[in-house]
Amino acid sequence: MRLIIVSGRSGSGKSTALNVLEDNGFYCIDNLPASLLPDLAQRALLHTELLQPQVAVSIDARNLPSQLQRFPELLQEVRDNHINCDVLYLDADDETLLKRFSETRRRHPLTTDTRSLAEAIGDESQLLGPIADLADLKLDTTSLNLYQLRDTIKLRLLNKPEPGTAFLVESFGFKRGMPVDADLVFDVRCLPNPYWKPELRDHSGLEPEVREYLAAQPDVEEMYQDIVGYLNKWLPRFAASNRSYVTVAIGCTGGHHRSVYLAERIGAALRDSLKNVQIRHRDLSS
């Protein structure tokens, strides 16, 4: 049996995440009282004829604060029964959440006559702290549209075939900010930039012209060898510490050339020694 617990601040994309999981064969329950989590997991484990072997539940700020405070012990009770359980925590920056609520005109569950939307969003972070602290995977949805979020959920959760550590090698551009969920960040802006070659500017690091140019640069090859050597040494230590997800981010200026090229090569190299390695290019379509 596999259990995914979805949480996060209101407006961060929890409903979308549950919809994706439901579309992919999960039995989904929204707004589960946290205190019922161990009982639900146990019943699902014992009565597979009633529930699918894949279950996803949403636990968020609609719960009583006292139940949210108990989340660590409730989660441990589930895991003591040897259930394959992942905690997904979604979030976005305050400005984005405010904008999303303004656009949809939906009411935040914590707003009252004396508590503004901005205050409710801030208070929600504290309420959900016990869940956020134990999240196996945190996703920042600030810059993701609906379709990108759906694709990210599929990549990170549904492409994880078995218990163990899922590794993601992600390219990005510093001009759009660093990925907040990255565990390791490598800055490759010091390398020769194909952008300044007019014939390469409109190509990406996935295309032969850019790949050939970068492969011929000694500094690029040296950077690649150093990063792969470091990761081959230390990523198995992350896996040994029972981490479910590890994100390695490779950043250049725009996220189109150098970081894309290196992320592809590094991801391919890591697949020789690690089981579950995925590659994603955050800014390639922008």
UniProtKB/Swiss-Prot annotation:
ATP binds at residues 8-15. The keyword GTP-binding applies. It comes from the Bacteria. This is Nucleotide-binding protein PA4465. GTP binds at residues 60-63. HAMAP family: RapZ_like. GO terms for molecular function: ATP binding; GTP binding; molecular adaptor activity. Belongs to the RapZ-like family. Displays ATPase and GTPase activities. It comes from Pseudomonas aeruginosa (strain ATCC 15692 / DSM 22644 / CIP 104116 / JCM 14847 / LMG 12228 / 1C / PRS 101 / PAO1). The keyword Membrane does not apply. It holds the Pfam family RapZ-like_N. Keywords: ATP-binding, GTP-binding, Nucleotide-binding.
